[in-house]
Amino acid sequence: MRKLAIIGASGHGRVVADIARKNGYSEIVFLDDDENIHECGGYPVIGKSAEAGMIDADVIVGIGNASVRRRIQESIPDEKLIILIHPDAVVAEDIVIGTGTVVMAGTVINPGARIGKGCIINTCSCVDHDCEVGDYVHIAVGSHLCGTVSVGNGTWIGAGATVSNNVSICSNCMIGAGSVVVKDVPDNVTAFGSPAKVIK
């Protein structure tokens, strides 16, 4: 029997649970630090996030916030963490994906791509050939990285955004939904628009 503990009893966590079920996990439980939450999507909440290392189960962090996801994931032994890929994702054979990353339905990841740990590659997004995606990145619903794009750690690419070929987006950035990024973006900024411009 394959058992999975998902940290984060939320809407995102329910999506992760659905992917886990499709990957053959027959027992799914949640961990959450909110003592008022007792179930999520019909699955029981059995404890808090700090208990993840002690549970006899595989573990994945199902939390959208990158800084929280990173803090929790880095407290869990690597050997307990898994990668989840929806069976309807199209994933090239030679890609590299780090532990704790979730790849959702309809996603395309093309040859030569490298994706770090703890990432969310969300529904119907595209990571094209030879892209380098850092740790704890969120590629949101329907966003597209064209070929040879680089995305730094902790960056959030908003829903429906497009990043043009050979562009580098540095760490801890936020790219607004629907933006078109055609130039490099420095660390720790928010960029928005078509073409995207740094707004703070």
Please provide the spans of the model-predicted regions.
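Short amphipathic alpha-helical segments
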Residues: 17-20, 71-75, 115, 186-187
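Short helix-capping segments at alpha-helix termini
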Residues: 23-25, 77-79, 183
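Phosphate-bearing ligand-interacting subdomains
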Residues: 36-91
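Generic structural signal for conserved hydrophobic packing positions in ordered secondary structure
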Residues: 8, 59, 81, 128-129
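Hydrophobic, well-ordered beta-alpha structural blocks that scaffold small-molecule cofactor pockets
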Residues: 1-49, 101
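Structural signal for interior beta-strand "rungs" in well-ordered beta-sheet cores
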Residues: 84-192, 196-199
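Short alpha-helical
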Residues: 11, 67-68, 198
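Cofactor-binding loop segments of dinucleotide-utilizing enzymes, especially the Rossmann-like FAD-
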Residues: 9, 32-33, 64, 86, ...
